[in-house]
């Protein structure tokens, strides 16, 4: 994937073709390839940021509150994108305070409080109440049982 000319200049045609290919894979409805990122919605900007990581063949994406400050539609768009990347085998490390988002998008949940690891559980083994209990009480109810 050479995006520069032999003299080191960016090859706009190659860059656009590669961008279209990646965005089609990640977000088939994305049509604003030539728009500046600053003109995009929050969800579209998240898609572009994720596409950059995919372009550089990241094995793991670390996402800190990827849906914070997004509207309902954009939140779902980013969630769908995260699910698609998981299905493609990309590792996702998601940092979130949204327990519903965790339950929907994660395989495992780790809870930390004051720098201490409270517990790591598979989402199918815990409820949102269990997670909230770990956050509030600072103990893992699964380990006490």
Regions found by a protein language model. Give the residues of each.
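Glycine-rich phosphate-binding loops of nucleotide-dependent enzymes
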Residues: 1-145
């Amino acid at each position: 994937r050479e995006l520069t000319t032999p003299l080191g200049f960016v090859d706009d045609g190659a860059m656009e073709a590669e961008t279209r290919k990646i965005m089609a894979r990640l977000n088939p409805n994305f049509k604003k390839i030539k728009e500046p990122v600053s003109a995009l919605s929050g969800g579209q900007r998240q898609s572009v940021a994720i596409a950059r990581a995919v372009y550089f063949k990241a094995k793991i994406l670390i996402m800190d509150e990827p849906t914070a400050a997004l509207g309902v539609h954009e939140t779902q768009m980013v969630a769908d994108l995260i699910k698609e990347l998981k299905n493609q085998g990309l590792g996702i490390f998601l940092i979130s305070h949204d327990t519903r988002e965790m339950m929907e998008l994660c395989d495992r949940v780790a809870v930390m409080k004051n720098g201490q690891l409270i517990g790591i559980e598979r989402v199918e083994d815990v409820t949102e109440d269990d997670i909230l209990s770990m956050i509030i009480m600072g103990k893992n109810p699964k380990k006490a049982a």
